[in-house]
Amino acid sequence: MGREFGNLARIRHVISYSLSPFEQRAFPSYFSKGIPNVLRRTRERILRVAPPFVVVYLIYTWGNQEFEQSKRKNPAMYENDK
């Protein structure tokens, strides 16, 4: 553990590759390829993903409406009250 920098342990069979930060581009072809690719993937998958979400939304709203309606009193029960 007490080794100094430059005299570190030798590690075998480990290969690491790196690229200088000065040679990298932050967003290469972000606007020319990235955004159109997202749109293409969305268009391809929308018919597979959207129907379950629509069904869940409709069931959720129906359930909330039924719950709110079940909390209300029935006016027919109180017609003869004075």
From Swiss-Prot:
Localization terms from the record: Mitochondrion inner membrane
Annotated positions of the N6-acetyllysine modification: K33
Keywords recorded for this protein, A-Z: Acetylation, Electron transport, Membrane, Mitochondrion, Mitochondrion inner membrane, Phosphoprotein, Respiratory chain, Transmembrane, Transmembrane helix, Transport
Keyword Metal-binding: no
Function: Component of the ubiquinol-cytochrome c oxidoreductase, a multisubunit transmembrane complex that is part of the mitochondrial electron transport chain which drives oxidative phosphorylation.
Quaternary structure and interacting proteins, as annotated: Component of the ubiquinol-cytochrome c oxidoreductase (cytochrome b-c1 complex, complex III, CIII), a multisubunit enzyme composed of 11 subunits. The complex is composed of 3 respiratory subunits cytochrome b, cytochrome c1 and Rieske protein UQCRFS1, 2 core protein subunits UQCRC1/QCR1 and UQCRC2/QCR2, and 6 low-molecular weight protein subunits UQCRH/QCR6, UQCRB/QCR7, UQCRQ/QCR8, UQCR10/QCR9, UQCR11/QCR10 and subunit 9, the cleavage product of Rieske protein UQCRFS1.
UniProt-recorded name of the protein: Cytochrome b-c1 complex subunit 8
Protein's organism: Mus musculus
Gene: Uqcrq
